[in-house]
């Protein structure tokens, strides 16, 4: 199953942003949900199935370099996708709370990302990764991620623009970046979500 936002606009140009500014952190522990609720202040009731996620922030601004997306895998396992600045602050916060909560994290230095946007982005991703379309997210703070083989594909609303972040090991991601370029997505130097 895959999702997109019902109220977000698509970029005019089909674009691919190769992105070294995102960090992926896998977060787990028997008290991972408690930490997200108590320390980060998140309401986890909307996370009803694996892949659902939400946008959060460490500084009160959902569009800053301290914002993040966190995806639910289970009560004890989550994935953060966030800018480098936010990842450093989040790692410090988790380290500070590890004595209080049964939590741990792994910075996935083996994973890289690119951002895809444009009118053809959703359909191209559904076709390329054999995803089943069907979910429409009305809340801009919700996001969704789906695993397809070695690739994790996410849907986020960034400043009222539908964007998709593709996450995989570098060699796999390079292959998919070439594929997306063959599908008409121009590589841009503009900062993405």
What do the PLM-derived regions correspond to, one by one?
Residues 1-193:
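Basic, glycine/lysine-rich polyanion-binding surfaces/domains
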